Regions:
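A short, N-terminal "cap"/entry segment at the start of jelly-roll beta-barrel domains
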Residues: 1-33
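Glyoxalase I/VOC metalloenzyme domain signal
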Residues: 7-10, 43, 105
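Ligand-binding loop in jelly-roll beta-barrel domains
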Residues: 21, 55, 73, 83-108
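Catalytic core of non-heme Fe(II) oxygenases with the double-stranded beta-helix
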Residues: 18-27, 34-36, 43-49, 57
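Histidine-centered metal-chelating micro-motifs
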Residues: 46-48, 67, 79, 83-88
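Glycine- and acidic-residue-biased ligand/ion/polar-headgroup-sensing regions
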Residues: 43, 52-68, 75
């Protein structure tokens, strides 16, 4: 049996770092501060360009469609943003849900 199991249906969505972004924490590594989360972006939301100074970001789009720098990402897209590298702005063309892993504390600048 796995040492840690959780069900998303047993968790609650929490406010994210921007209005219109919600987070559902599936797991937090108490040693590194890293998190595995579901992220929900409200349709029409634009998240400004930003960096994550303390963590690499790995994201897989579960549903929805968003645009960044003229590229459109849809269900099945995977992307990686290295720690400290500016990315965005992101525009949610529809509601977007992603499975995202930050390998260190989730901070935004």
């Amino acid at each position: 049996m796995f040492p840690y199991v959780t069900l998303a249906k047993d968790k609650s969505w929490q406010p994210g770092p921007y209005d219109g972004v919600e987070l559902l924490v599936l797991h937090k590594n108490e040693t590194t501060g890293g998190v595995t989360i579901l992220r929900k972006f409200r349709e029409g939301l634009t998240v400004p360009a930003h960096i994550h100074p303390l963590a690499n970001e790995y994201a897989y789009v579960l549903s929805g469609e968003w645009e960044e720098s003229g590229a459109v990402y849809t269900t099945g897209a995977f992307f990686f943003a290295p720690k400290g590298v500016k990315h965005g702005p992101h525009h949610a063309k529809t509601e977007v849900i992603s499975l995202t892993v930050f390998d260190g504390p989730l901070t935004v600048q």
